[in-house]
A protein has these predicted regions:
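Conserved catalytic core of the tyrosine transesterase superfamily
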Residues: 1-2
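Short, basic (Lys/Arg/His-rich) helix/loop patches that form interaction surfaces
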Residues: 9, 46, 54-74, 81-126, ...
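The alpha-helix within a helix-turn-helix
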Residues: 6, 17, 125
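C-terminal secondary-structure termini that scaffold catalytic or DNA-interacting sites
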Residues: 38-40, 50-54, 58-66, 71-77, ...
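Hydrophobic/aromatic ligand-binding patch that stacks against planar heteroaromatic rings
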Residues: 5, 15, 113
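Residue-level marker of regulatory loop/turn positions in helix-turn-helix DNA-binding domains and
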Residues: 5, 103, 145
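Conserved tyrosine-mediated DNA breakage-rejoining catalytic core shared by Y-recombinases
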Residues: 9, 14-61, 131-138
Length: 181
């Protein structure tokens, strides 16, 4: 479930592994990652697709931890190697021949998908929480485009779940394997 959520949100591993319930708004379907856990040290709002909300509701129902959304079996933030080990154990192929997929590689997949499907560069870059390197541009472009990104993230979720138009390009990871994580 943690891996599927990571893929659906195009988030970094550390952001998802340390995710807490107080960051989640299930009514407005937004996850706000605090600045201290973000690479760019700025809070990041993530619009949540219907499938991402389903995962969170399932986690809440399990009530494995009062604070952490995806706790380890010991009740702490999972190790940074947990997703890497899972992908290796499942032998999930990378787009690079002979290599195993990485958690971070799903962010690249999202970026490619967004470009190939005609989404504005700004939407994809904001979804990935990338900063604008041009200082002048950054000064004038302060919005996170949250509402504009909602449709893109819902379309990404349909693609990831195999309901998109381009299903022949979807690499299958069994739902059982995803749930085991």
């Amino acid at each position: 479930t943690m891996l599927e959520f990571l893929i659906l949100t195009a988030a970094r591993s550390g952001e998802v592994r340390a995710m807490t319930w107080d960051e989640v708004d299930l009514v407005d379907c937004v996850w706000t990652v605090p600045a201290e856990r973000m690479k760019a040290n700025a809070a990041h709002r993530v619009p949540l697709s219907g499938r991402a909300i389903e995962i969170l509701e399932g986690q809440k129902e399990l009530a494995k931890h009062p604070d952490l959304v995806f706790p380890s079996q010991g009740g702490s933030v999972p190790s940074d190697m947990i997703l890497t080990k899972f992908l290796r154990d499942q032998k999930v192929a990378s787009s690079e021949k002979g290599r195993v997929a990485t958690a971070h590689g799903f962010r690249s997949s999202f970026r490619d998908w967004a470009s190939e499907n005609g989404y504005a560069r700004d939407y994809a870059e904001r979804a990935l929480a990338h900063t604008v390197s041009n200082q002048t541009e950054a000064a004038y472009h302060r919005t996170d485009l949250l509402e504009q990104r909602r449709g893109m993230m819902e379309a990404w979720a349909r693609y990831v779940c195999g309901m998109g138009a381009d299903n022949d390009k979807v690499v299958s990871i069994s739902r059982e394997a995803l749930s085991a994580n």
